[in-house]
Every structure is written in C-alpha cells, then in structure tokens.
Regions:
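Single-stranded nucleic acid-binding surfaces, predominantly the OB-fold ssDNA-binding core
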Residues: 2-144
Length: 144
C-alpha cells in the first residue's frame, strides 16, 4: 500500500481565484464591426445577433461587445470586409462578463422610449462561415 501524499496539481499550486467568470457560448451573426475612438485611445467593438431556441424558428438576442484578446480581434478584423459587404457572417463565439445597459431611442418609431442593450466582452471566435462557406483561420482565407 502506498501511503505517500499526492503531489499537488499545477492548478492547485496556482494562486486562489479572485475573479468569477460569466461566459456565454453560442452561434450568431456578426454585425457592426467598428473601431471606437475615445479620449483614452481606441478599442474595437461589434454586435452579435445570437441565435437560440428551435432550429426551425430561432430567436435572436443581441449583444454589443468590446473585442478582447489578440486572436479574437485578428479574426474579427479579417471578417470585417465580409460584414461591410453585407454578406452573412456566422460565428461560433464566447462572451464574458455580460451586463444590461439602458438607453433612450433617439429616432424612429420608438423615439423617447427606453431600451436595453446587453453589453460584454468578446473573448473568442472559434469558427466562422461567410454566406455558408467555412473560413480557414489557420490560413486567414476563405475555405474552398
């Protein structure tokens, strides 16, 4: 019988967690890819129309997100031209730290009414399709 104590794993040897993560994984349409310029510099943002519910009649939830992480930013910048050309860009994504933010409609039929936007951080684009054709991120080109 072996009575030696188990070696601590690498994860157990790390510092204790000081932050709790809230992640959302899904599939949706990439829209409004843009660089936002503010006094302290700039950042990249986009919106994602996430699909959920029945495959036959999916519902949509909209997220307005700041793009975090070098790989996610590189992939979104690559997809930007397709979004701007009004092609259908579908992405498998991961969001973090979502929260609601209220706003007032400035124009249109809802002018003056309060709306709610779901904000967050885009952490990852796992895969993408443009007009149904897979994107090869390894080569940063459209797959044939």
């Amino acid at each position: 019988m072996n009575t030696t104590a188990a070696e601590p794993t690498a994860a157990a040897a790390e510092k204790p967690k000081t932050h709790l993560d809230l992640h959302v994984n899904g599939i949706g349409y990439l829209n409004r890819v843009r660089e936002v310029k503010v006094k302290k510099g700039s950042f990249w943002a986009c919106s994602i129309a996430a699909l959920h519910g029945s495959i036959d009649a999916p519902e949509t939830t909209y997220f307005d997100v700041k793009i975090e992480g070098a790989e996610a930013l590189e992939r979104v910048k690559f997809l930007k031209s397709a979004v701007n050309a009004n092609q259908k860009v579908t992405v498998a994504f991961r969001l973090g730290d979502i929260y609601p933010e209220s706003f007032v409609y400035q124009s249109g039929p809802k002018q003056g009414q309060t709306g709610v936007s779901i904000k967050g951080r885009l952490l990852k684009i796992a895969s993408a399709k443009i007009d149904g054709m897979p994107v090869d991120f390894a080569e940063m080109r459209f797959a044939a």
